[in-house]
């Protein structure tokens, strides 16, 4: 079983293959920036963290913006993709502190956090629940994650925004060699030297009549050893993803959006992911196909004698 230790505001995980830290206060959700270490190659994540949670949105066509919390668009950061906030604030920067539970199984440890949004815009009410479960197994260079939303509103197209696998900070491409988008292919780091809007290049928007075979997004980390593994996030059911960005705005922005479908008060939506290091695209595809179609994770038992299963 991986080792787990709570130290102040952080949960430290160490397995035979990786190390990771979860921050429960400050900049929260997902795995902390720079803490996900691949013990085989020495690679670390290069961004603001992995599986980082934001807020709830909806398409804005034909709807007025909330004057007190307008969604900005028409710039390099957001392009001309019109959205409107439904519930706020942004979890990663504004929640400040997340309740958590730690679970221990025979060959894994898991951490579950949650947050209830306290603010809503215009016609909506606050109270939607976000739950995130991170499962860290022994013997693998990846972990399994799930985000689940329980809506407090009726909405024609409710969207949950997150970073998947996570934004990529770099200095003129020195830290990474390539981006990989399964629905597009490999893209050299040289394409990300100057800022461009999300709707200029590499924008994914779901077409239910032509879903991609896999939804894998990530980057190849340059290492001193030259082994250069891929760090990717795999959303295991492509139908769960409504939109995904991959653009440069001072860093490579890996925004991903889930849902985008009609939902009623009390209903749930979300996705499940594999996030980790791989030596090749073939290796990614092999693991993806092992778990293909999964959309959630559930914990069973108590915190000392736990099993987990796909939801």
Predicted regions and their residues:
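Beta-strand-rich recognition/accessory modules
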Residues: 2-14, 198-311
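Acidic-aromatic substrate-binding/catalytic surfaces of carbohydrate-active enzymes
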Residues: 8-120
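Short, solvent-exposed loop/turn segments at secondary-structure junctions
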Residues: 18-20, 27-28, 118, 150, ...
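Residues at beta-strand starts and edge strands
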Residues: 9, 16, 30, 107-111, ...
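Broad, structure-driven detector of short, well-ordered beta-strand segments within folded domains
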Residues: 17-25, 126-136, 229-235
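Short solvent-exposed loop/turn micro-motifs enriched in small/polar/acidic residues
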Residues: 3-6, 93-95, 127-129
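Acidic, contiguous internal or C-terminal segments within carbohydrate-active enzymes
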Residues: 101-172
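Polysaccharide-binding surfaces and accessory modules of carbohydrate-active proteins
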Residues: 46-47, 154-228
């Amino acid at each position: 079983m991986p080792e787990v230790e709570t130290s102040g505001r952080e949960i430290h995980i160490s397995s035979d293959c990786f190390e990771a830290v979860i921050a429960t206060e400050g900049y929260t959700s997902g795995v902390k920036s720079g803490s996900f270490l691949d013990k085989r190659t020495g690679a670390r994540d290069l961004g603001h963290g992995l599986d980082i949670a934001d807020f709830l949105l909806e398409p804005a066509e034909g709807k007025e913006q909330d004057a007190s919390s307008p969604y900005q668009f028409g710039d390099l950061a957001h392009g001309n993709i019109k959205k409107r906030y439904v519930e706020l604030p942004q979890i990663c920067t504004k929640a400040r502190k997340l309740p958590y539970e730690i679970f221990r199984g025979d060959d894994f440890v898991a951490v579950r956090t949650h947050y209830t949004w306290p603010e809503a815009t215009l016609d909506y009410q606050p109270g939607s629940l976000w739950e995130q479960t991170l499962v860290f197994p022994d013997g693998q260079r990846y972990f399994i994650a799930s985000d689940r939303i329980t809506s407090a509103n009726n909405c024609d197209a409710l969207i949950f925004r997150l970073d998947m696998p996570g934004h990529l900070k770099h200095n003129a491409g020195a830290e990474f060699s390539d981006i990989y988008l399964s629905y597009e292919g490999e893209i050299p780091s040289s394409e990300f030297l100057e800022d461009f809007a999300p709707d200029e290049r590499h924008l994914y928007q779901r077409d239910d009549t032509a879903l991609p075979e896999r939804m894998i997004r990530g980057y190849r980390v340059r290492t001193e050893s030259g082994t250069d593994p891929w760090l990717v996030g795999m959303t295991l059911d492509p139908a769960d993803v409504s939109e995904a960005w991959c653009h440069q705005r001072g860093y490579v922005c890996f925004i991903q959006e889930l849902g985008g479908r009609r939902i009623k008060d009390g209903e749930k939506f979300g996705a499940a992911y594999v996030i980790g290091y791989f030596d090749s695209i073939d290796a990614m595809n092999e693991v993806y196909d092992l778990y293909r179609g999964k959309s959630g994770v559930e914990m069973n038992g108590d915190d000392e004698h736990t099993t987990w299963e796909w939801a």
